[in-house]
Curated annotation (Swiss-Prot):
GO terms for molecular function: structural constituent of ribosome. NCBIfam families: rpsB_bact. It comes from Prototheca wickerhamii. GO terms for biological process: translation. It comes from the Eukaryota. Gene3D superfamilies: Glucose-6-phosphate isomerase like protein, domain 1 (3.40.50.10490), Helix hairpin bin (1.10.287.610). It is found in: Mitochondrion. HAMAP family: Ribosomal_uS2_B. This is Small ribosomal subunit protein uS2m. Belongs to the universal ribosomal protein uS2 family. The gene is RPS2. One of its GO terms (cellular component) is mitochondrial small ribosomal subunit.
Length: 274
């Protein structure tokens, strides 16, 4: 699917059933039985197969074979690892934990932002506040130097609280503000007259959609002993990733499916607590 069409994808006709099993959360666009159709199994093509591997040795257990010089991922392993990862995610959220979602792939920026807006709009604030996210650029030291970074996040949220609506209404554009907004908008928000910092110093788990581009984040998480869930393609190194999900992490359909699955988990938890 062309990246220009990503912005057209929205959450539509999502079936909500609070009694569903949290390991098999289904929607009307569930692709759990259609991974091949979604391109989840497609790995990377090696330029010189005789000289370089098109798959990383740490992904050998998820490797099904090679066809037309392209590695093929075992989708049964994908489904197994996905169930395990979302079970861990559900248990952490159900016990009041915090989750950090990271997807810095620029092609998925619009899709990721729209997904979070949908989740925020359709869930209680208390439930959504357990989620923090980064979809633009991971700033090194955000976790290990949280004391300093949190001051910048607070200043951004405070400015948004005072001037955000005014700037938007009068079409006033600050280049620096827009750049900071892309980096920090998922770390804090305004609830009434109070400021809520959704990013805690130490999240209980980090969900990374493109771990290959966020190696520094994985190092920070390992240093702080934070478990990491990662969508790993066949060329990814799984070292430092606690719960790898072997897949094609550039698949639009699979990425959208993960966001829908996350929404179903959060809705299940919010319904359970009522």
């Amino acid at each position: 699917m062309n990246s220009t069409k990503i912005k057209e994808i929205e959450f539509q006709n999502v079936i909500v059933d609070p009694k569903i099993n949290n390991l098999h959360l289904k929607t009307n666009t569930d692709i759990s039985s259609n991974y091949y159709k979604a391109g989840t199994h497609i790995g990377h093509k090696s330029i010189h197969l005789s000289e370089t591997h098109s798959w990383h040795p740490s992904m050998a257990q998820y490797h099904l074979g090679i066809r037309d010089n392209i590695t093929i991922c075992n989708v049964q392993q994908t489904q197994k690892c996905l169930s395990r990862a979302f079970y861990v995610l559900t248990q952490i959220l159900d016990n009041g934990g915090n989750v950090l979602i990271v997807n810095t792939n620029p092609e998925f920026y619009k899709l990721s932002i729209n997904s979070m807006k949908f989740i925020e709009k359709n869930l209680p604030f208390q439930t959504f506040s357990a989620i923090s996210y980064c979809f633009y650029k991971w700033i090194g030291g955000t976790l290990t130097n949280y004391k300093q970074i949190s001051k910048s996040i607070y200043c951004y949220v405070k400015f948004t609280q005072r001037c955000g609506k005014f700037c938007e209404k009068n079409n006033i554009d600050f280049t620096r503000y827009q750049k900071i907004k892309k980096c920090f908008q998922g770390y804090g928000s305004v609830s009434g007259d109070s400021i809520v910092m959704s990013l805690q110093k130490k999240p209980d788990v980090i969900f990374i959609f493109n771990p290959g581009d966020n190696k520094n984040l994985i190092l920070e998480a390992n240093r702080l002993q934070i478990p990491v869930i990662g969508c790993t393609d066949m060329s990814s190194n799984t070292n430092g990733i606690s719960y790898p999900i072997p897949c094609n992490n550039t698949s639009v359909e699979f990425t959208l499916y993960l966001y829908k699955k996350l929404y179903k988990v959060l809705h299940y938890i919010s319904t359970k607590k009522k």
